[in-house]
Amino acid sequence: LEICREADLLVLEDNPYGLLGFDDEPYRALRADEHDRVVYLGSFSKTFAPGMRVGWVLAPHAVREKLVLAQESSTLCPPTFSQQMVSAYLEGYDWLGQVKQFREMYRERRDAMLGALTDMMPAGTSWTVPTGGFYVWLRLPDGMDAGAMLPRAVTARVAYVPGTAFYADGFGSQCIRLSYCFPTPERIREGVRRLASVIEQELELREVFGTSTRALPPSYDAPGPDLT
């Protein structure tokens, strides 16, 4: 904040997962310390319902006026029904109590994923230990490419987001993002088992070809899954 203050820059604080931390208290928002320089974004899609695409903005007055104009031009008639649903929910229900239940549920699912990764992933694989939110960031063994491996993972009926989706310069090809938001602990463990098997197969291929899977012929692929 001090650097942005000296450079006269605004800070955009996008914090949809801020209330879903696994510690006793949520992290303090940057805007709590700098009202005039921080634009804070929040969402009910993570703490109420995923289909409830309603969010909010806290911004300095001058910025807020510009945001209102931009919103009016990009979304002529935002749905009032969903906004009224959120309003009724906040007024009539213990929404903080609901958030606490979500935090416990996601903590259990995070622990299930971390335990499965520890038990099943081959050597050379590493991952983060998230303190909140929905995701684990996993780094594959050296020389592996997450994008090249994805079709074979889908064939095994498990999916992820390659790390390159989160960078503008192509970085992250060795990384993947895993979600523990929706599956039960049992399905999380099964998904990790399938992913670990795919990674082990990729490592075997690398030993045979002496190169990363990115360099394999384009025609190389596993058979499609039997969906019958």
Label each residue range with its predicted role.
Residues 1-10, 17-49:
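Active-site pre-lysine segment of PLP-dependent enzymes
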Residues 155, 168-228:
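PLP-dependent enzyme catalytic core of the Aspartate aminotransferase-like
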Residues 144-149, 186-190:
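Short, conserved charged micro-motifs
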Residues 39-104, 220-221:
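Conserved core segment of the aminotransferase class I/II
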